[in-house]
A protein has these predicted regions:
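Amphipathic alpha-helical polymerization modules
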Residues: 1-112
Length: 112
């Protein structure tokens, strides 16, 4: 079982990655009408799994999305980005709740 510091570290990495993902989504939406713009996404799930398996640090990566391009070369789908934004928001709330729970447990352990 992971200790509190490890759990908090994993949750912190997750929250940081979700913030990066939100920034990428916002950037994609801002460029929905920019000719030639290629949407990006942040991948961290595989990095987190590898770091947990190896016991090392995890890093999020920003990679281009492989969607089909429109005639102007832009591959941003507004409906996809809006859906991703909602999913990201729910994931952020879940991680935030888990982090609050961890701090509550630590507080209870300290104060008795």
């Amino acid at each position: 079982m992971a200790d509190a510091a490890e759990s908090i570290g994993i949750l912190q990495f997750s929250l940081d990655s979700l913030v990066q993902q939100q920034q990428a989504i916002a950037n994609n939406i801002a460029n929905v009408n920019t000719p030639g713009y290629q949407a990006t996404k942040v991948t961290f799930e595989s990095s987190l799994a590898k770091a947990l398996a190896d016991g090392g640090a995890a890093t999020a990566q920003i990679v281009p999305e492989g969607l089909a391009s429109a005639s102007d070369g832009n591959n941003v789908s507004l409906s996809t980005e809006m859906t991703l934004m909602q999913v990201n928001s729910l994931q952020s709330q879940t991680v935030d709740n888990a982090l609050s729970d961890q701090f509550s447990i630590l507080s209870d352990a300290i104060t008795g």
